[in-house]
């Protein structure tokens, strides 16, 4: 049986990522309380560190997953270059989405300055002339009887801010190595505790950064004898704020479409509902970096002795 695609909008977990980010942040903000409640025992220092880093890593993954989810929905519903509106084909489009194609579209948004200008293009929807951005993020809010110039101006400014925010999300997402290190088997470890710069002659430490809240993952290098290591310092505040922003975008794609379908159970509940708007300044605040070092990248060259050890280990396995 093929379910009615309209049910998708009524039942979709539109707050999934926001809810997850909220409880992860709440636990991180009061770790001693939740350590006792969850584990029902006193954790030693290593266990506490593992718990804390697990939560931070989960928040980071949630951010990446929110971006991926948003763009899948965004492309599934986007009418640009199509001869039809796909609101009721959303399940088919999502099921037939191709990962590499989606990634390429996201990359174009990140790297092409004018990649989102199509959101300002006008389309004819029913009897209304609206922008594609209006259609995507404010579906149903375009009836002449309810649209004032002030409201239209607010929607236009909001769409302009959304374009600004989408560039940030796309840029964060296209560097896939970190997400894949979580997604395709856990290949990320808290290996680096500090980064220091010192005087070669005196061995005196001049600068030291605490990296105890960092996670490291390994990448292939062009040389078979090299290993590239990327270390990223956890930025809980940014991960949380950007996840909430992305979650709100998902909410806009789903919620306003749900209202246009006029489900009986919604008639009383949503007689009145708030219309929310995005702004560049609040998005920039979400995007603020709160750590001294974001990315630390270095390459290790394996020596002949390293390769001999590696060969010996491989022979024994």
Residue map of PLM features:
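Short, solvent-exposed secondary-structure capping/transition elements
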Residues: 69-87, 188-193
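Acidic, Ser/Thr/Gly/Pro-rich intrinsically disordered interaction regions
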Residues: 1-61, 109-317
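Alpha-helical protein-protein interaction scaffolds
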Residues: 59, 63-65, 72
């Amino acid at each position: 049986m093929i379910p009615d695609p309209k049910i998708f909008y009524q039942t979709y977990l539109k707050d999934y990522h926001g809810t997850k980010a909220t409880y992860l942040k709440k636990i991180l903000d009061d770790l001693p309380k939740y350590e006792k409640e969850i584990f029902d025992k006193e954790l030693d220092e290593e266990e506490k560190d593992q718990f804390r880093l697990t939560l931070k890593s989960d928040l980071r993954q949630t951010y990446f997953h929110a971006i991926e989810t948003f763009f899948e929905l965004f492309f599934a519903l986007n009418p640009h270059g199509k001869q039809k509106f796909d609101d009721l084909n959303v399940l088919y489009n999502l099921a037939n989405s191709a990962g590499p194609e989606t990634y390429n579209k996201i990359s174009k948004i990140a790297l092409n300055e004018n990649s989102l200008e199509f959101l300002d293009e006008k389309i004819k929807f029913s009897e209304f002339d609206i922008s594609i951005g209006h259609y995507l993020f404010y579906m149903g809010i375009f009836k002449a009887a309810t649209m004032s110039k002030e409201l239209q101006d607010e929607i236009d400014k909001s769409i302009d801010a959304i374009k600004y925010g989408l560039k940030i999300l796309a840029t964060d997402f296209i560097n896939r190595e970190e997400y894949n290190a979580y997604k395709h088997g856990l290949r990320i470890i808290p290996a680096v505790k500090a980064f220091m710069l010192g005087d070669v002659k005196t061995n005196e430490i001049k600068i030291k950064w605490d990296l105890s809240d960092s996670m490291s993952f390994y990448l292939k290098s062009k040389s078979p004898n090299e290993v590239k290591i990327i270390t990223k310092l956890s930025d809980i505040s940014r991960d949380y704020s950007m996840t909430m922003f992305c979650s709100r975008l998902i909410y806009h794609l789903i919620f306003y479409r749900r209202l246009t379908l006029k489900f009986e159970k919604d008639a009383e509940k949503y007689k009145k509902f708030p219309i929310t708007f995005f702004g560049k300044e609040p998005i920039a605040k979400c995007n603020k970096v709160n750590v001294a070092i974001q990315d630390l990248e270095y390459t290790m060259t394996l020596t002949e002795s390293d390769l001999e050890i590696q060969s010996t280990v491989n022979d024994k396995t």
